[in-house]
Design a protein with these regions (language model features):
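Short amphipathic alpha-helical interface segments
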Residues: 224-234
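Active-site HxH/HxHxD metal-binding segment of metal-dependent hydrolases
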Residues: 41, 45-130
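Metallo-beta-lactamase
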Residues: 37, 130, 137-144, 148-222
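Short acidic-hydrophobic surface loop/beta-edge motif
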Residues: 4, 22, 128-134
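Hydrophobic/aromatic beta-strand patches that form the interior of the parallel beta-sheet core
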Residues: 11, 30, 58, 82, ...
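A structural signal for the main folded, soluble domain(s) of proteins
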Residues: 5, 20-21, 39-41, 48, ...
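Conserved beta-strand hairpin/beta-sheet module of binuclear metal-dependent hydrolase folds
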Residues: 1-50, 152-163
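Divalent metal-coordination and catalytic microenvironments
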Residues: 9, 22, 33, 61, ...
Length: 234
């Protein structure tokens, strides 16, 4: 798993998705998501190869490709995990997870997703604004839609990690956009237009500069509306 600098102390790990992290110093970092369960060894080794250990996890949302290793790092390194209350509730137990994996029987949920069950140490407030976490000051933007408690996270370097609120340009034609709430997703994407950041990082492998953001939002909105129209026409 390669790592790539974005700006200042903000970097990304390049796995199946991009996992941003913020370096507190030369040895400690805050992970913004933890990727898939199957990426655990590669993710951990990439950090170790660069002399880094996680000091905390600030999670955009609790889907399998974003919070898949939260509990592992929380328990192994004795570090805090921060989630919104809505996402924390989903991870509170197997029955709660069944609401996410609605079509799967309970036994399959346990086999496929038991690793997602954990209790966060910090509940991210249900509002936009600053969040002090593990000695760093982040800006939180509530961006529900893709999931109930999805957030975008801006690092002190003016890098905004939008998680799954936006698809990168390379994914616009390769991925079916999913939203728990289509309308909330539309509103959250529009909200991103006003974010005062220099770079925007998308979980599904992409980044854009401030001046490129508006066009990318337009294309995301058009894709969502087009797919919704196709479904409606069935």
């Amino acid at each position: 798993m390669d790592i790539r600098p974005i700006k200042g102390n903000t970097w990304v790990l390049e796995g199946m998705e991009w996992i941003p992290f913020y370096k507190l110093d030369e040895r400690r970092c805050i992970l913004l998501d933890t990727g898939l369960l199957g990426e655990r060894e590669e993710l951990e080794q990439a950090l170790l190869d660069h002399g880094l250990t996680p000091a905390g996890i600030l999670c955009s949302h609790a889907h399998v490709d974003h919070g898949g290793n939260n509990r592992y790092f929380q328990e192994k390194y004795q570090i805090p995990v921060a989630l919104t209350a809505k996402e924390a509730g989903m991870c509170a137990g197997l029955l709660n997870l069944k609401c996410y994996f609605l079509m799967l029987p309970p036994g399959m949920v346990e086999r496929e997703a038991a690793h997602l069950v954990h209790t966060p140490d910090v509940i991210v407030p249900d509002r936009d604004g600053p969040l002090s976490f593990c000695g760093a000051e982040f800006q939180i933007l509530q961006t529900p839609g893709h999931s109930a408690g999805h957030i975008a996270i801006q690092t002190p370097d003016r890098v905004c990690y939008v998680g799954d609120a936006l698809l990168s340009r390379e994914q616009l034609w390769a991925k079916l956009p999913y939203c728990l709430s289509h309308q909330a997703g539309i509103e959250s994407r529009e909200k991103l237009r006003d974010v005062d950041a220099d770079f925007f990082v998308m979980a599904h492998r992409g980044m854009c500069r401030r001046e490129e953001l508006s066009a990318l939002i337009d294309d995301n909105q058009a894709l969502a509306q087009r797919r919704a129209g196709e479904v409606l026409a069935l």
